[in-house]
Amino acid sequence: MSERQDLQVIANLVPEGSRVLDLGCGDGELLAHLIAHRGCRGYGIEWDSTNVERCVARNVNVIQYNLDEGLALFDDASFDVVLQLDTLQHLRNTAHMLQETARVGRLGIVSFPN
């Protein structure tokens, strides 16, 4: 696990013990950090097969899924926190995904590169 400063910055925004959905979770590093340091639980969503395998290797719950399909597989308010970090710019329907983020999570944290 790297000691990346951005992991801790995001972790400080996530309440301890939260149920987290990490959209476009990559290799699962952030979710693994939240589990280890904030007592969180939850799922990552990732499309890339190599990253899904890396999540599994980290013992991160991951669903291989195309986010352009939306989040219909989750009920309203299923998660305390939904993370969408550097993901939005890769999606075709950004407005819909922001609506879905608000629907399934009580708190949404969204970032994108400048």
What is each model feature region?
Residues 1-78:
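Conserved N-terminal segment of class I S-adenosyl-L-methionine
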Residues 83:
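A conserved beta-strand element that flanks and buttresses the S-adenosyl-L-methionine
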Residues 34-37, 100, 114:
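Glycosyltransferases and closely related glycan-assembly transferases
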Residues 105-113:
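Conserved beta-strand signature within the Rossmann-like core of class I S-adenosyl-L-methionine
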Residues 91-104:
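A short, conserved alpha-helix within the catalytic core of class I
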Residues 87:
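Hydrophobic adenine-recognition pocket in adenosine-nucleotide-binding enzymes
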